């Protein structure tokens, strides 16, 4: 069944019987939940400044990306860092156009969360396609890539 998918990333995301693929998905979900919790906790404190709240979400997302760092794919770490810094710059620019500091902090936190999560998805898909030569194309669809090994 898995051999029908031409894209390696689709193969690894859709073939749930593979333990390496399911391990990668669970790592991604853990990372997203950690980033979301940090965004919510920083937006609850509405008295704080927008820059501090966004910075807290940014550094929390860095600490939640240990799986990408452990995978050995350096461009993915570089891309995540660039996208997080870009999200921080964009979100803080909204602070100057918003009169409500509470709403601005809430919006900024979830903007950083969205950028970080989309960066994770893009990195997982790109790295899986790059390592397509390392994927065995047997009947069981074994996506044995180093990316999804914990």
Swiss-Prot record:
GO CC term (a single one)? membrane
Q: Which domain of life is it from?
A: Eukaryota
Q: Where in the cell is it found?
A: Membrane
Give the knockout phenotype: Synthetic lethal with MSS4.
Q: Topological domain, Cytoplasmic: which ranges?
A: 98-104
Extracellular compartment residues: 1-76, 126-150
Indicate whether Nucleotidyltransferase appears among the record's keywords.
no
Does this entry carry the keyword GTP-binding? no
User: What keywords sit in the KW lines?
Assistant: Membrane, Transmembrane, Transmembrane helix
Q: Which residues cross the membrane?
A: 77-97, 105-125
Q: Name one GO biological process term.
A: endocytosis
User: How does this chain sit within the bilayer?
Assistant: Multi-pass membrane protein
Any further remarks? Answer: Present with 339 molecules/cell in log phase SD medium.
Protein name listed in UniProt: Protein SLM6
